[in-house]
Amino acid sequence: FIAFFSVSAIMACNSNVSKSNEGNLQINQVPANDDSEMTVLMREMYDNFEIIKDSIVAGKTVDRILFNNVRRTHWASPTDSTILGPAFEGKAVDFLDKVDSLLLEKVNKEMYFNFTVQACLNCHQEFCPGPIEKVKKLLIQPKH
């Protein structure tokens, strides 16, 4: 789960995040041009989080495979290796704790999903603010 958070943070640094078609998992993308491994992983995770969000909003079961790539953040090379360190790792741990809670939650999935996205935003605010507005779009808005 730490990997997932790390990936989310670095993905956010790249403003050219692609959106997958609903239901398509993008787990094994090859970096294009000069994209770092972390950037590619962040794109995959963003796409997966869109699918997770749609499933939660529709009241469907979230496919756990959508979380399979989060641990890759431990070995994916970031665009800027200077971000790696105790502060970044702390944000990653927080994010992965949120992912664990989301996976265990049975009733308040929307709330726990938003907690997880907020953990992404917290890291991006400190390390990579570029994609913050895009990541905010993942938040599930309250029903009126």
Residue ranges and their predicted role:
Residues 9-12:
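C-terminal motif of bacterial Sec signal peptides marking the signal peptidase cleavage site
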Residues 116-128:
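The canonical Cys-X-X-Cys-His
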Residues 16-117, 132-144:
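Extracytoplasmic c-type cytochrome modules immediately beyond a signal peptide or single-pass transmembrane anchor
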Residues 1-4:
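Sec-dependent signal peptide recognition
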